[in-house]
């Protein structure tokens, strides 16, 4: 798993699309993800919410304020990878969320 990749993720009967947010070198044992809210959810003007772009493999908004540790047993199909521009926006949102600017 690499940073910026998007996957289907299942917990119980709930399915979600997630994006790997942690650095690739940590992902074999300590991956962290952010949930991609559905396309029907409007992206509020909040610095920790990243709207996906036309070239991304999923439509919606990445919610950086709800980071979670990945359970590898819950990971389903790989959907694709975020575009470089969306990944840069994700970087900025993470720095904002952790007050690292």
State what each model feature region is:
Residues 1-101:
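Conserved functional hotspots at enzyme active or ligand-binding sites that engage polyanionic ligands
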